[in-house]
Amino acid sequence: MARERDALYAAGCVLYWAEGAKSRNSLKVTNADAEVLVYFARFLRTHFDVPDEKMRVNCNLFADHLERQRTIEDYWLHRLELPRTCLRKTIVNTYSKYSQKKRQNLLPYGTTALVVNSTQIVQTIYGSIQEYGGFDRPEWLD
């Protein structure tokens, strides 16, 4: 079945294989590059008809982002074409008391996770990855 699909499907599966958090019932891809998450969202919308309200966005920011938290959240939501209702609690990491604060603004928009809870989609993607890769990983499948 997987080999009959288009390039978007194949790339979406490989993207999840490489960057996704492996779970039995939840898809989660985290990245600092908005294009990665935009592509993954398009894959989910196109091939699995995932509606916006089923997508969740989790931002992970750093202390130097605190003043721009709302702007950064809006950036991710805009890029992913999702309403604010999809945003979950943003985590802002604070500096330790030992930090010299030398590593500021390395990731201007922090990192963000795109999450969809669906056992059926996870299992379909796992099966496709195994078909593309030519291997069996029974622990992935129900």
Which role does the model predict for each range below?
Residues 1-142:
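Domain-length accessory/inserted modules outside core catalytic folds
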